[in-house]
Amino acid sequence: MKFVRRSILVFALALAVARCADQPTAVKAPAGPQFLRWAETPQFSARTTDPRARRSGAMALTPPLSLEQYAVSFWAVRGESRSVQINYRSSIDNNVHPFLQLTTTDPQSVPGVGELAMGDSVLITVTVDTTKIGVSLEPSGLQFGAPAQLKIWYDGAGGDLNGDGVADSTDAAIEAQVLGLWYREKDSDPWTKLGASQSLDEKSFTYALPHFCEYDVAEALMEWAVNY
């Protein structure tokens, strides 16, 4: 099995909402996104696919690992399903909640390396942003044959989506009507909405990632956000 070193470029994924109008039910086009903030500073843990454990019809995961530096890495292997799941513990209810799940089966091409053969690996690193609800994904420019499946939960915001300190009907309207997954490549770029699937019951977005870099970017930070 050939292993591929990771790139130094980082591509970020974040959740955000924009400011709403003064009227509780009114919404206006945003000048820019306002990132969703954690309702508190959570404690994170991560589990990755355990390649030594083979369970029919189930994903076998390693024991939870505390994220001291808020980052976790795993080897994505072409032709094999590999996953990472990041959870957080809330001091509000003292329960463990899901935050992110990333599953890959077909890492196809790495910048500077080329196409991967079946069984070749690339090291993927996920870094959690502790100030806003978001993560960074690397290596940049990694392309997938079959898209990687990304799922991210936003209930860590505590229901306060517009940042006014309370969770009320305005937040519910924002969530149900205009919340979406967006991204940008660099600070000077406008935000662009992605065709992600939203689950109001789970308070999550799911998106099929064709690659970590949506466009040909050299040394730019790509941010992804939930916005309206």
Positions of the model-derived regions?
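Bacterial N-terminal signal peptides that target proteins for export
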Residues: 1-8
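C-terminal motif of bacterial Sec signal peptides marking the signal peptidase cleavage site
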Residues: 16-19
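Proteolytic cleavage junctions
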Residues: 21-97, 108, 141-145, 158-228
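Short beta-strand elements of extracellular/lumenal beta-sandwich folds
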Residues: 130-137
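Structural beta-strand segments of beta-rich domains
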Residues: 146-150
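Short edge beta-strand/loop segments characteristic of extracellular beta-sandwich folds
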Residues: 151-155
